[in-house]
Amino acid sequence: PGVGQTGSLEDLNAEKSYGAMKVHMNTVAGNEMLVLESVKRYPNANFYGLNPGIIKTDIRSNFMGHNKALFGLIEGLIGLLTPSAEAYADKIVPLLVAPDLEGHSGVHFNKTGDAILPSPGLTDSHVKTFLAASERLIARIGVSVAH
């Protein structure tokens, strides 16, 4: 959240061509839009966006195919330069359970727990269009979304 990504509607499901970063940034934008829209759809619940940045995990293990050496090298560098998942959790979990957070649904937080602004291109119109396209994709497999 808050990194300026608005998502790419022309090939939302990467069926025409696949680009790892393009697909990843679509999910980043989509997650941010889910927070923004959920605040409006479900006013009795709280929603927050998290942008931890790059964290050392196994989530990228398929990104480099089966090249375990390259994966190990890259994850090792990431581990040296960025916080671990545990360090991020130590910082963010107390924030997410703080009583002062009540009433601030829709806020996005960066890797240090500071509030950040939503991406500027995520207008109400764009969010509705993107989420409608997402709902059409999942409807193809028989899943419907309640509004």
Model regions and ranges:
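Catalytic loop of short-chain dehydrogenase/reductase
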Residues: P1-N44, N51-A69, I74-L77, L81
